[in-house]
Regions:
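Acidic, low-complexity intrinsically disordered segments
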Residues: 2-244
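Radical SAM enzyme core and accessory elements
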Residues: 1-41, 91-96, 402-558
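Structural recognition of alpha->loop->beta junctions
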Residues: 139-158, 292, 297-303, 354-369
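Flexible glycine/acidic-rich beta-alpha junction loops that bind and position SAM and/or redox cofactors
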Residues: 25-28, 134-138, 218, 260, ...
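Conserved beta-strand positions
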Residues: 18, 100, 128, 250-252, ...
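A structural motif corresponding to the C-terminal end of an alpha-helix
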Residues: 67-76, 242-243, 272, 328-336, ...
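Radical SAM [4Fe-4S] cluster-binding motif and immediate context
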Residues: 179-337, 342-344, 350-357
Length: 558
C-alpha cells in the first residue's frame, strides 16, 4: 500500500492491542491448529524426526514487538494467548485498535478473533497483517478495517499521523524461549541465548516461491532498517549492553548480500575488538563471494542456506557447489542449517529418493525440509492460479497447507497424497544417516576449536574459546549418550565413538570423567523424554502480556 493510500486512525492517541493468534497450537482442532504444525520452528520443520533429540523452543512474535517499539501510542502486546485469555482482554480493557498478526494456516483463528472484536468492542478498528495478508479477498473475508501487506512500521506511523521516516528503535529480544533438548532445559542465564536483530526485511533475490520476498515487494526489493555498518554496529552495541549478549541471531533473509554494510561492520568489529558471534541467513553464491577469512572475522558461526538440489534453477545457487560450500564452512567451525524443498517441478517418483540422498549427503548440522508450496501472494501462487492447478484457489480451507503435509497444487509428476510420505522419508533418512543434530554440532564446534582456539588474532581466539567452552563437558556427555542410544545404528555409533575419542584426546581427564558420568545421566533423561513423547505430550508457548509505559499511566489515571 502506498503512503498516500494509508488511512488515518479514527481517534486521537488511540489505545492499541497487538496480538498473535490464539493457542493451543500443537493439536488438531476446529480452528485449524494441527499437531503436525506446532508453534516451534525447529520441531515443526527442522528436527521433526529426531524424537527426544529434537531441539524444542519458541520464538516470540518479533514483528509485533518491532511495531510497538516504533510508535507513540498507549499499547499492549498479547503474545500466544489462549482464546479465553484474548476474550478476557477484550472484556477487561477498552481498545481503539486491535492489530492481529497471522499466517495463512491460521485463517480460522484470525476469523474467530475478528468476530469477537466486533461482538465485544464494535467501535475498535481491526488491523490485520503478516503473511495472511496474501490470501484472496482477505479484508472482506475477515471483516477487517485494514490489511497491511509489507513493512508495518512505516504503515503504522502513517496510520497514527507520525513521522514514518523517524529512526527505527530495535526492541530488546532474546531469540528463543524455553529451549530444551534430550529432556533438558538449556541455559537461560544472561548471555546464554542470542539476541534477535532485524536489520532488513524482504529479499531481492525474488525466488518465485518465497513469501517473504513477495511480502516486501518481490525481486529487487527490500527494506533496510539500518542502511550502514555504522548504524548496525551501534545497535549491536546496545543489544550487547542491555541483554548481556555476544551472540546475535540476525533475522535478515540474505544478510551478507548487503556487502558494503557487512564489510563495514567487520571493520568496526576489528577496531573495537568485538568477538561477536553471528547467526545469519545467506545464499550459497553470496557466501562464495566472501573469503573464509572475512566470514570468520565477521563472527559468522551459523548459516541458514538453501540446498534446493543439483539441478536447481534458482539464481541464488547458480555457480555454487553447495557440498563444497558446506564442507568449507564446517572445516572452519561454522555450523550450517541446510534447507531443501521437496516437490520441485522436476521431482518425480523415480528421482525423488536420489534428490533426498543428495540433500542428506551435505550432513549439515540441521536440515529443514519443506514442501514446494504456492503460498498466496507469491508469483508461484499466481502461476498455478493461471494454469488452473491450485487445489483450492480461494484458500477456503488452508489449515493443512503449511509445508509439512500436502501440496496446495496438483504436482505434474508426484501423485497427490504421496508428498507427505516423501517429506517424512527425507527427515527420517537425514536422522538415520547423520544422527542427531547435537552430534553434528559437536563435531563442527571441535573443528573450530582446533583451528582457532590458539589463533594469533585475539578477537577470533576469544570467540572460538567461548563457543567451544561446552565441548569438554556438555557436548562430550551428549556424544557419549548418542553413542549408547544408537548402538544398533553402526554408522552413527561409529561417528559418536570417533568424536568422543577426539574430544577426550583434546581435553583430557576432565572430559573423560564428564563424558561418562554426564553421559549416563543424560541417557536416562533421553529415555524419559522418549516416554513423554510416546504419551503424546506436546509443548505450548507461555502467554506474554506486555504494556507500554503510557498505557500503564492511562490505566492508573482511569
Amino acid at each position: 500500500m502506498c503512503p498516500a493510500a494509508t488511512p488515518r486512525v479514527k481517534v486521537p492517541r488511540p489505545r492499541i492491542l497487538f496480538t498473535s493468534v490464539f493457542g493451543p497450537y500443537a493439536q488438531d482442532d476446529e480452528y485449524g491448529s494441527r499437531a503436525i504444525n506446532p508453534m516451534e520452528l525447529y520441531h515443526n520443520q527442522v528436527t521433526r524426526a529426531q524424537g527426544p533429540f529434537s531441539l524444542r523452543m519458541f520464538h516470540r512474535s518479533w514483528g509485533l514487538m518491532m511495531l510497538r517499539e516504533n510508535i507513540s501510542a498507549p499499547n499492549a502486546l498479547l503474545d500466544f494467548p489462549t482464546l479465553e485469555r484474548f476474550t478476557a482482554e477484550l472484556r477487561r480493557e477498552k481498545y481503539d485498535v486491535v492489530a492481529i498478526s497471522a499466517i495463512p494456516p491460521n485463517y480460522l483463528k484470525a476469523e474467530k478473533m475478528c468476530r469477537l472484536i466486533r461482538e465485544i468492542q464494535p467501535e475498535a478498528e481491526i488491523v490485520v497483517g503478516g503473511h495472511i495478508s496474501g490470501l484472496p479477498d482477505i479484508q472482506q473475508r475477515l471483516g477487517a478495517d485494514h490489511v497491511v501487506r509489507g513493512e508495518g512500521v512505516r504503515w503504522f506511523r502513517r496510520f497514527l499521523g507520525q513521522d514514518e521516516n523517524a529512526p527505527v528503535h530495535h526492541p530488546r529480544i532474546l531469540s528463543g524461549v524455553g529451549a530444551r533438548t534430550m529432556g533438558v532445559r538449556l541455559g537461560e542465564k544472561p548471555g546464554d541465548t542470542a539476541a534477535t536483530l532485524i536489520p532488513s526485511v524482504g529479499c531481492p533475490m525474488g525466488c518465485n516461491f518465497c513469501a517473504t520476498s513477495a511480502m516486501f515487494g518481490g525481486k529487487g526489493k527490500f527494506v533496510n532498517f539500518y542502511e550502514t555498518g555504522d548504524e548496525l554496529f551501534r545497535e549491536m552495541e546496545g543489544l550487547e549492553r542491555d541483554l548481556h549478549v555476544q551472540t546475535f541471531f540476525i533475522m535478515d533473509e540474505n544478510f551478507l548480500l548487503h556487502r558494503k554494510r557487512a564489510l563495514r561492520l567487520l571493520e568496526l568489529m576489528k577496531e573495537q575488538n568485538k568477538s561477536w558471534s553471528l547467526y545469519v541467513f545467506s545464499s550459497a553464491n553470496v557466501l562464495k563471494s566472501y573469503t573464509i577469512e572475512q566470514l570468520v572475522g565477521l563472527g559468522v558461526s551459523w548459516v541458514w542456506m538453501g540446498l534446493e538440489g543439483k539441478a536447481s534453477r534458482y539464481h541464488k545457487l547458480q555457480g555454487a557447489d553447495t557440498l563444497d560450500v558446506v564442507r568449507t564452512l564446517q572445516a572452519h567451525g561454522i555450523s550450517v542449517l541446510g534447507s531443501t524443498i521437496i516437490g520441485l517441478e522436476e521431482h518425480t517418483p523415480d528421482n525423488m529418493a536420489e534428490a533426498i540422498e543428495h540433500a542428506v549427503s551435505h550432513n549439515t548440522e540441521f536440515h529443514q525440509f519443506m514442501l514446494y508450496t504456492p503460498v498466496p501472494g507469491t508469483p508461484l501462487f499466481e502461476e498455478h492460479k493461471e494454469k488452473g492447478t491450485l487445489v483450492d484457489p480461494e484458500w477456503a480451507n488452508g489449515s493443512d497447507i503449511h509445508g509439512q503435509l500436502r501440496f496446495a497444487h496438483r504436482h505434474p509428476h508426484l501423485p497427490a497424497g504421496t508428498e507427505g510420505t516423501w517429506l517424512l522419508h527425507a527427515f527420517n533418512r537425514d536422522f538415520e544417516v547423520n544422527g542427531p543434530s547435537i552430534l553434528r554440532m559437536a563435531q563442527t564446534a571441535l573443528r573450530g576449536w582446533q583451528r582457532y582456539s590458539q589463533a594469533a588474532d585475539q578477537r577470533i581466539r576469544t570467540r572460538f574459546r567461548r563457543e567451544g567452552a561446552r565441548l569438554p563437558v556438555d557436548y562430550a556427555a551428549a556424544v557419549w549418550a548418542v553413542g549408547r542410544y544408537f548402538r544398533t545404528n553402526d554408522g552413527v555409533a561409529r561417528r559418536a565413538a570417533e568424536l568422543l575419542e577426539q574430544l577426550r584426546a583434546e581435553f583430557g581427564l576432565k572430559c573423560r570423567v564428564a563424558s561418562t558420568l554426564g553421559g549416563r545421566w543424560l541417557l536416562r533423561s533421553i529415555r524419559r523424554e522418549e516416554q513423554r513423547l510416546a504419551r503424546g505430550e506436546t509443548c505450548e508457548p507461555p502467554t506474554f502480556y506486555e504494556k507500554s509505559a503510557d498505557f500503564l499511566t492511562l490505566r492508573t489515571a482511569s
